[in-house]
Amino acid sequence: NSETHVSDVINDVLQYTQDIIVVNDGSTDATLQVVSRFVGIDVVSYSQNRGKGYAISKGLDHALTQGFTHAVTIDADGQHKACDIPKLVETASRHEDALIIGSRHFGNPFMPQGNRFANRFSNFWFRLQTGIGLPDTQTGFRLYPLLKMGKMRPFTRRYEAELELLVRAAWCNIELIPTTIDVYYPPIDERISHFRKGRDFVRISLLNTALCIIALVYGYPSMFVRKLWKKFLS
């Protein structure tokens, strides 16, 4: 439900591209009506809320079927700034097969402490599962290399899906490149969050446990074999 901010987000993005896909994840407010006012916006919509992971999958699938080679994901809550899109695109122009990660500045005094803890928690598990250190594994502002990723989509359906995608991309030796972005943090009474602290924290913890086990039997061996094969071919 993003009727308050989605119009501003679309207008901001339109300054940089006309190719916009809006995924309406079963909103129950006026989000769909607001989006329908824009001419030429591609909308993927379904009636039941399926979670962020499902929405990402639908959006990436749609972009791929439309012939796009890359796709930028940006949240509809207004926290991400469209003016950072060129940064991600410029980095991708030099690393076309890489997954570009919009990395937030954690020295921002307006960043909630809960966000800082969640990111440190996520970064720790990501390094354990991949051997790679990243400054921000929680950000939703990313540029995905669709052709390189192929049919890779998250199995999980909610917030944990973004971490899952990073881990699986790392296991496939897809280069992960962080690029610094700015983030707007509104006053507490204006913040929109669909994160369910108890239930989603348990889901993320279960996912991390599963990924650690998979990393031992598949992730690390796969990374080693792929690197060895790449070295052999070169």
Where are these regions (language model features)?
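Acidic helix N-cap motif at the loop->helix transition within catalytic regions
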Residues: 4-8, 29-37
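Residues at the starts of beta-strands that form the adenosine-phosphate
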Residues: 19-20, 70, 175
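A conserved acidic beta->alpha catalytic loop
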Residues: 24-33, 78
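Acceptor/aglycone-binding surface of glycosyltransferases and processive sugar-polymer synthases
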Residues: 48-65, 82-159, 186-195, 199-205
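Short beta-strand-to-loop acidic/aromatic patch adjacent to the donor-nucleotide binding site
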Residues: 68-79
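Hydrophobic helical membrane-anchoring modules
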Residues: 131, 154-234
